[in-house]
């Protein structure tokens, strides 16, 4: 990440899913924007053509576990194996934990193989209380140079 460059980093979690990924890809293409997609291995298994399209369009891909596991509910080894299983399909050195948290033991285990990427701005596009205009206004208000947006 070059802090001298005026840029933000757009990321998407939990896909690929047919309900939204094609629209996202089309929009990114339209504006010639690249993003990083943190994908769930099981979704990549179900929708391999969407995964292939993300890669073909030149976007970065990251691992978001195979089953979208929360690390506090599972043994460290179980969680780590889920991440490694996802990487058999995703082939990435980037990792983002579901919900943005993980145990310290999981962090220390995974950081040996992965660059762990978090964020500093959540769009809350999933909220039923916000419309598209609210989401855009929040991003405009809180984004700064180098922000990682999810």
Predicted stretch roles:
Residues 1-70, 91-92:
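Active-site beta->alpha N-cap acidic-glycine motif
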Residues 49-50, 72-80, 106-109:
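Metal-dependent catalytic neighborhoods of phosphoester/phosphodiester hydrolases
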Residues 68-74, 125-127:
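A short acidic, helix-capping loop that chelates divalent metal ions and anchors anionic groups
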Residues 79-90:
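An active-site-proximal "capping" alpha-helix that borders the catalytic cofactor pocket
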């Amino acid at each position: 990440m070059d802090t001298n460059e005026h840029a933000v980093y757009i990321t998407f979690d939990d896909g690929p899913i047919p309900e939204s990924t094609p629209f996202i890809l089309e929009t990114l293409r339209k504006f010639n924007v690249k993003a990083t997609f943190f994908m769930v291995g099981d979704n990549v298994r179900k929708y391999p053509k969407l995964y292939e399209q993300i890669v073909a369009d030149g976007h970065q891909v990251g691992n978001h576990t195979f089953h979208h596991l929360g690390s506090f509910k599972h043994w460290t080894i179980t969680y780590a194996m889920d991440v490694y299983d996802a990487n058999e399909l995703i082939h990435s050195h980037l990792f983002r934990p579901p919900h943005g948290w993980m145990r310290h033991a999981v962090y220390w285990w995974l950081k040996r193989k992965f660059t762990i990427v978090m964020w500093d701005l959540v769009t809350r596009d999933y909220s039923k209380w916000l419309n598209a205009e609210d989401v855009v206004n929040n991003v405009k208000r809180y984004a700064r140079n180098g922000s990682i947006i999810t």
